[in-house]
Regions:
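Catalytic Walker B motif of ABC-type/P-loop ATPase nucleotide-binding domains
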Residues: 158-161
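A short, proline-enriched helix->beta-strand linker immediately N-terminal to the Walker B motif
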Residues: 152-156
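Short coil-to-helix segment of the ABC ATPase nucleotide-binding domain corresponding to the Q-loop/switch region
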Residues: 95-102
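ABC-type ATPase nucleotide-binding domains, specifically the catalytic core motifs of the NBD
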Residues: 12, 102-115, 123
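Helix-to-loop junction immediately C-terminal to a conserved catalytic motif
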Residues: 49
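ABC ATPase NBD coupling module
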Residues: 66-83
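Conserved ABC ATPase signature
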Residues: 133-137, 141
């Protein structure tokens, strides 16, 4: 489903030249990418998601080249096959919760499915927030809506960027279980990128991310 090979990224100037390990993730699999600050976690996430273009190497999605696609085609492919939970939630603030989820389905080339949206929100304890404005939600509620938005179009890959870094132990377990359950329901691969060492107790498949700057 998701495969990377020989990824490197050069920030140019005095910025680091970063090399990353190869990854392969199939539907239904989970992988934890651990790394301290400065190891390039966010850079790697952006490369995988097609938000940056690698200096070298490739990203394949659903068995096809992804990283080398034109930007517009890359955006469309991402919308169809990926769901992303960002560290800070991003929504269209003028829309309701259900409208934000329907927009995600539309960007994936799907018709809005009110029944799926309602069922998904109810499963996350947010059925009563269906028509609420996202800026009226608490931080925790926004995070759950972010998870709903990441899976509403049934993507093949879910990427989560530091989903638990600001949470206490109890809420860390709650959010992690929500992610895993929703990924399983969608039949999606789950990739969590974080510095949160607590997640090692929950996910056995993991890679310690420590890319070595290269001069090449």
């Amino acid at each position: 489903m998701l495969r990377t090979q020989g990824l490197r990224y050069n920030y140019g100037g005095d910025g680091p030249n970063m090399a990353f390990p190869d990854l392969e993730l199939k539907r239904g699999e989970e992988l934890l990418l651990l790394g301290a600050s400065g190891t390039g976690k966010t850079t790697l996430l952006h490369l995988i998601a097609g938000m940056r273009t690698p200096t070298e190497g490739t990203v394949e999605l659903v068995g096809k080249p992804f990283s080398g696609l034109p930007v517009a085609e890359r955006d469309l492919t991402r919308g169809q096959h990926m769901g992303i939970v960002f560290q800070t939630a991003h929504f269209v603030r003028s829309l309701t919760v259900s409208e934000n989820l329907a927009l995600c389905q539309s960007l994936a080339g799907q018709e809005a499915d009110p029944h799926r949206i309602q069922a998904l929100l109810e499963g996350l304890g947010l059925g009563h927030k269906l028509n609420a404005r996202v800026d009226a939600l608490s931080v925790g509620e926004q995070q759950r809506v972010s998870i709903a938005r990441a899976v509403v179009h049934k993507p093949g890959v879910i990427l989560a960027d530091e989903p638990t870094s600001a949470l206490d132990d109890q809420n860390t377990e709650v959010v992690l279980q929500l992610l895993r359950n929703q990924a399983a329901d969608a039949g999606a691969a789950l990739l969590i990128v974080t510095h949160d060492q607590r997640l090692k107790d929950h996910l056995t498949e993991r890679i310690e991310l420590s890319p070595i700057p290269t001069s090449a």
